[in-house]
Amino acid sequence: MMTYMGNNQVSSEELKRRIINRWDEASKYYDYDRFTDEDINSKVRDTWKEFFNKELGSERLKILDVGTGTGFLSILLAEMGHEVVGIDLSEMMISLCSKKAQEKDLQLDLRIGDAESIPFENECFDVVVSRWVLWTVLHPEKAITDWKRVLKPGGRAYAFDTPSVEREANTIDKYFRPNLAKLVISIYERRNAWSEYYDKVIRSRLPLNYDKKGSFDRQMKLFVDCGFMDVAATKMDEASALSAEIWGRMPWRYQLGWTCNYEWYCIRGSKAVEPQEKDNHHFGEN
């Protein structure tokens, strides 16, 4: 006899297993820079490095990259001279990041790890960064709280994201076009494009999933609710412009199915400094 399990009856452990499987599969096709030339890819890296130079200053810092994926942030921060630790649930993503780092002769500390339960002691990082991560976390408030735990007093957390474009509530835009695109991609690239996307059960259990209105605003609120100070969101104009250019170069089969938001934003927050430490704290100064 078949037993039906509702969305809320699927355990977090089972959901996390499905999420890991999804990212292991997606790792094979995750990097869109395969569709662009080195000129624009180099501009993207330089733009993000310029942002971090302004934010972090010239001091060598110990940085945790949560959800490192194929290593976009980890690699460029290591190239800037920082000590970088990257964690990800997906072993395949970690493997790809490690391969890229070796090709560039960079030393990264890469580990399989959960954004909600950082495998490090309290107050051991100067900075925590994440890029396109919070939307895919089952318990984002738990994750952000743990990021704050591993930060040193006065340290900063950065969450980079592109706020979702609200889809019109019609069948064509919400269902038909994405599924048509996945069909075309599957045929053209000889793979199962559906395997890279979350099923309905997972999507319903992700509080900050892009399908849910106001998910970006809730990210900011969670930073405040979890105790971060000086929380602010900043639009990254140059990174956004380059993102728009890259999307314009994407194959038509990808543009067919999705409305892309090119606008990169950074949510930042600081961990409070203990009163006795304030006079000697100079984080991010050149």
Predicted region positions:
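A short acidic, Gly/Pro-enriched loop at the edge of an enzyme's catalytic core
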Residues: 116-127
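Short alpha-helix
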Residues: 209-227
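Conserved class I S-adenosyl-L-methionine
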Residues: 2-58, 72-76, 96, 156-190, 234-237, ...
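Class I SAM-dependent methyltransferase SAM/SAH-binding core
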Residues: 64-66, 70-117
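A short glycine-rich, Lys/Arg-flanked "PGG" loop and its adjoining helix->strand segment in the class I
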Residues: 141-153
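A short SAM/SAH-binding and catalytic strip from SAM-dependent methyltransferases
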Residues: 127-140
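Core SAM-dependent methyltransferase catalytic element
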Residues: 226, 248-286
